[in-house]
Design a protein with these regions (language model features):
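Acidic (Asp/Glu)-rich catalytic clusters
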Residues: 89-97, 123-131, 261-264, 291-301
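Carbohydrate-binding surfaces of carbohydrate-active enzymes
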Residues: 26, 199, 226-247, 255-257, ...
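Catalytic domains of carbohydrate-active enzymes, especially glycoside hydrolases
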Residues: 78-107, 204-211, 332-343, 410
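Active-site-adjacent "subsite" loops/lids of carbohydrate-active enzymes
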Residues: 64-83, 121, 137-208
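Hydrophobic faces of well-ordered beta-strands that scaffold small-molecule active sites
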Residues: 47-54, 101-103, 135-137, 213-215, ...
Length: 587
């Protein structure tokens, strides 16, 4: 028996890393289209939060490692968040200016056991729509609670996932801390009967009025999972034709590794939960992992696909068991939006219970979220239809890239080009400089051709080698701008974006030190290479404004605008400050 468990564990661990199976999309699979992203779902137009819940979610938590420590009171709130607690929750969502949530539609129980939850959610969806909140339906792609499913839907017995003649069960969270959930049998999406079974559940969600379908537990064989997404999109198109409603969007938890990410070409939306710590300064270490990963994800996806990014671990612990501080909540939101994503957040467990019961720790965190969401809603133009202004690209093969961390901490304006997806993200010819780290794998013929074309078009390629120091300055010199100088730098970094017409630039400044504001920061922003000298010979005809969710009227002094340089001093950056430079209309 012990040997069998060990074998099952090793196979389950393999499936946890199913991104090790490279995915190559085949021509017959559905391709998502930008016109199917409705205006409210475009990047910068939404504030998203997960609202996992219902009796079926409480049952699931009891049978999985992340929910085993929930108290009876936490499980009670979770069970009733879609019925007796929902009106209070709706008020909280409105208070915090959320306009997009997801709900637990189906997570692996039988049709019969999920029926009450579906009926509750029909009312939830209607109430959300009445209040301007859009709703995604969460479904599990591979999970079966076998006692329930096998009893009520006996055909599911035929759909189990096997490997080396061993039945596979849900396991996690990591290979080194592997806990097998024996109640959660995994299904094989390659089997048409299983996909048809899931599509019946997804179609019921569309009939209930949801705006999107979100697939989780994308575990197993890539060809079957991709076919499930394809089937979902075909169903969504059919329902749109039949009802006249907009087509529901589709997205899935594919994860960040580039070998499998191309599956997202089938989806309109990108949702990822690859954050492993909260942004900040921890024991003297300046953590910019999330900003780096968001840049990597932006290099993997289509430019038009909205991106939602979530931490499955916070600095205080697992997301279900702790509540990050107000300062951490604020910086997480600001970081995501500054770098072109939206924050996703799982409040299931400790946080949800604290909100419903009015606990001060939860209320303070929620108030911080509401404060920043209001700023985002009132200043959508800072995040909607914007693009990075960088002229430096950094080539990365994997999400982890120490050079990216160095560039971020030095406020080098750059974007990530992902080696396996050079056709995605910002086009390579938009950049002047491409920095290549030393540890890249061997290039394919297609990759070589793209890089050669970049160089032939006047692009500068810098091989970083092992000599990291000095690379940033070389890249900035070769790019010729833009460039940012902060004095004192402290733990502040900057990101520069712009409107597509080039007449508005947006400088995002984030202070990663939760304990102390950055004070009297001298800012020098050079926009060489970006301001069109034929239209505005210098910045003297540009308006400069400073905004912050932390202060009604942020103070700045010593404004000097000349040629392509803007200089000023910010008296205080508590967590997040935005500076806009806008060209005045010609007289």
């Amino acid at each position: 028996m012990r040997r069998s468990v060990a074998v099952i564990g090793s196979v389950a661990a393999f499936l946890l890393l199913c991104s090790a199976q490279p995915f190559q999309p085949v021509p017959k699979l559905y391709r998502a289209k930008p016109e199917d992203v409705l205006p409210w779902a475009e990047q910068g137009n939404f504030r998203f939060i997960r609202l996992d819940g219902g009796q079926i979610e409480s049952w699931k938590a009891e049978r999985t490692w992340w929910g085993e420590k929930f108290s009876s009171n936490e499980k009670e709130v979770l069970s009733h968040i879609y019925d007796r607690e929902f009106e209070q929750m709706l008020g909280l969502l409105k208070q915090a200016d959320f306009n997009w949530i997801w709900v637990t539609w189906s997570n692996g129980w039988s049709f019969k056991d999920e029926e009450e939850n579906r009926e509750n959610l029909k009312k939830v969806i209607a109430r959300c729509h009445e209040n301007g909140i859009h709703v995604s339906a969460y479904l599990s792609a591979s999970n079966m609670f076998r006692k329930s499913a096998f009893r009520d839907d006996p055909e599911t017995k035929k759909y189990g996932l096997w490997m080396h003649h061993i039945p596979l069960f849900y396991a996690g969270p990591t290979k080194t801390d592997l806990q097998i959930s024996w109640d959660r049998r995994l299904a094989d999406t390659r089997k048409p009967g299983w996909r048809a079974y899931l599509l019946k559940k997804a179609e019921l969600a569309v009939d209930a009025g949801v705006d999107a379908i979100a697939w989780d537990n994308m575990i197993g064989y890539n060809d079957g999972l991709a076919q499930l997404l394809d089937d979902t999109q075909r169903m969504a198109e059919r329902k749109a034709r039949e009802t006249g409603r907009p087509k529901v969007m589709v997205y899935a938890n594919v994860h960040i590794p580039p070998d499998r990410f191309a599956m997202n070409d089938i989806n309109e939306v990108i949702w990822e939960e690859d954050g492993k710590d909260t942004p900040g300064v921890w024991d003297g270490h300046w953590l910019v992992d999330n900003a780096r990963k968001i840049k990597f994800l932006s290099g993997e996806k289509q430019l038009w696909q909205p991106l939602m990014y979530e931490n499955d671990l916070y600095h205080c612990g697992p997301r279900e068991l702790c509540i990050p501080s107000p300062a951490e909540q604020k910086l997480s939101i600001a970081e995501a939006y500054a770098f072109g994503a939206a924050t996703s957040r799982n409040i299931e467990g400790r946080f949800l219970h604290g909100l419903i019961k009015g606990e001060p720790e939860a209320q303070e965190a929620w108030n911080a979220i509401a404060q920043y969401n209001r700023f985002l809603a009132e200043n959508k133009n800072l995040y909607h239809q914007t693009e990075p202004a960088a002229r430096i690209a950094l080539l990365s093969a994997e999400p982890h890239n120490p050079l990216a961390d160095e560039f971020l901490r030095q406020s080098i304006f750059f974007e990530t080009k992902v080696l396996a997806h050079l056709d995605k993200g910002a086009p390579l010819d938009r950049f002047k400089v491409l920095v290549m780290p030393a540890d890249l794998p061997k290039f394919s013929a297609e990759q070589k051709a793209r890089l050669n074309a970049f160089a032939a078009g006047g692009g500068v390629i810098i091989n970083a080698g092992k000599a990291g120091p000095g690379i940033a300055a070389r890249a900035e010199d070769a790019a010729g701008g833009p460039r940012l100088s902060l004095e004192p730098r402290g733990y502040v970094l900057g990101q520069l974006t712009r409107k597509p017409d080039g007449r508005t630039f947006i400088l995002h400044l984030l202070n990663y030190n939760h304990q102390a504001p950055a004070e009297n920061v001298k800012v020098r922003l050079e926009l060489s290479g970006l301001v069109d000298p034929g239209e505005a010979k210098d910045l003297s005809r540009w308006d400069v404004k400073v905004l912050s969710p932390d202060a009604a009227q942020p103070k700045f002094a010593g404004l000097s605008v000349h040629e392509n340089v803007c200089e000023f001093t910010l008296s205080r950056i508590e967590h997040y400050t935005v500076v806009t430079l806008s060209a005045r209309p010609a007289p």
